[in-house]
Amino acid sequence: MLTLGILCSGRLGLNTLSKIAKEYAIEFILTDSNSFGIIDFATNNHIPFFTGNPRKGNGYSFVRNFSVDVIASINYLFLIEKDIIEHSNSLTFNIHGSLLPKYRGRTPHVWANINGETKAE
């Protein structure tokens, strides 16, 4: 079975994580300390998790304890350092809610709304 490490935040992160966990083995989760739904999900499903700022090696000191095929980032609050990106056995990717670079950042749909657009392209 394909093994994954998931970096996610907020409701979008939780919804995506819940769906992914039905099909794949989640070895670890990185999230922020305010994503209570993700923390509860990890706790209830016995998935090891790290909360807080992963920068300066803090996240990697946790991640290096796991071997995963894929690392996926979904609406993750923090910038991801190179050591985490390179840790997967085959692929690390980010799911973003718009075409880059116009709406970069975590909430492209919000800025599209503010600008009166119907799509975050």
Give the positions of each predicted feature:
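One-carbon transfer enzymes
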Residues: 1-121
